[in-house]
Amino acid sequence: MSEKTTKFIKTIGVLAQNEYNARKKAILPSVCIAQAALESGWNLAAKSLFGIKGNGFKATTSEFYNGHYVQIEDTFRAYPNVAAAVVGYYDFLEKTPRYAGALNNSNYKDTVDKLIHTTDGAPYATDPNYISKIISIIEQYNLTIWDNKECGNQKSIEELADEV
């Protein structure tokens, strides 16, 4: 694993686990890390780690509509730093009713599925391969070690960071 990838996982992992442990309803840290990696291209300097649309900055993005990818310009939320982006991501998911099914799951595959198959049919992402991409990142980098609240792992965040 590259130094850049290790740093990314440790940085997002610590922040995600802090948010996960502090909230009553939250998404698994492994899913948070994988989404940040996919949406930002493993870039901690990205203004929008999670690709959440909203007021912030305009960028070109690919969306999948009517059976094919199209390039569109859209506006994304921007955050001043990585910590604020992670808090913003957890706030967004917690406050958006369509993602309620993705919160407090102990299984990352079910969690990712519920981000796409939402209660109102508006998925987190339009990419038909989004679920498999997120699951692949989680499994390739063993990101479930960050989900210790659910799996009973009593290791500290620092111990987990050392395992990456």
Regions found by a protein language model. Give the residues of each.
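Catalytic cores of secreted/periplasmic lytic hydrolases that degrade extracellular macromolecules
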Residues: M1-E163
